[in-house]
A protein has these predicted regions:
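The beta1-alpha1 cofactor-binding region of Rossmann-like NAD(H)/NADP(H)-dependent oxidoreductases
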Residues: 12-24, 55, 170-171
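Short C-terminal tail/terminal secondary-structure segment
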Residues: 98, 177, 188-201
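Active-site helix of classical SDR
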Residues: 73, 109, 117
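Residue(s) in the substrate-gating loop at a strand-loop-helix junction
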Residues: 93
Length: 201
């Protein structure tokens, strides 16, 4: 991006750590002077039957997938409220609406992301800050690699998707641009599903 002339910085850190979340927001504001758009996109997944799901896996996934959303939104939101505007986009999931199989902590976290989106929106809509979410369906990413490589499971998934294919990252671009732009100024607490029609069935 820097080669195109865009002013940018790359910040790294484990967003499962509360102090890192605070630092990332502070460093961004120090560099740019403001935060206009926050996309909460960090996520991990660990698969195991609920009866075997470890406390370590539970805590790791809740910290990264849910607690970081609260922390980053809170820190960035304080700044946005002070200036009277801002856009926050949380990445939810189909498991915001469904329970899933062998992913209890992931489902719990993504359900929480949906509720946090609405809770923040209820408080901040009148302050000029839009808080919404995108719920991707089955996308061809590292998180779904095990499913893609399982012929039977992949077939079952594709048979249910009316669009007949796995989603690609670029399929999310339109939703993200809409929620980050002035076109969504009257949209608050909405979870925009991008799933090829999965939830219709």
């Amino acid at each position: 991006m820097a080669e195109t002339g865009v002013d940018c910085i790359a910040l790294a850190g484990d967003v499962g750590d509360a102090t890192v979340c605070a630092r990332l927001v502070a460093d961004t504001i120090t560099h740019f002077g403001a935060i206009d758009i926050l996309v909460n996109n960090a996520g991990i997944i660990r698969r195991s039957p609920a009866v075997d799901h470890s406390e370590e896996d539970w805590q790791a996934i809740i910290n990264v997938n849910l607690s970081s959303v609260f922390r980053l939104t809170q820190h960035a939101g304080r700044h946005m409220i002070a200036k009277g505007r801002g856009k926050i986009i949380n990445i939810a999931s189909l498991l915001t609406f469904q329970g899933g199989i062998t992913v209890p902590s992931y489902a719990a976290a993504k359900g929480g992301v949906g509720q946090l989106t609405k809770a923040f929106a209820n408080e901040w809509a009148s302050k000029g800050v839009n808080v919404n979410a995108i719920a991707p369906g089955y996308f061809a990413t590292d998180n779904t690699e095990a499913l893609q490589k399982n012929p039977e499971r992949s077939r079952q998934i594709l048979e249910r998707i009316p669009a007949g294919r796995w989603g690609e990252p670029e399929d999310l671009a339109g939703a993200a641009v809409f929620l980050a732009s002035a076109a969504s100024n009257y949209v608050h607490g909405h979870i925009l599903v991008v799933d090829g029609g999965w939830l219709n069935r």
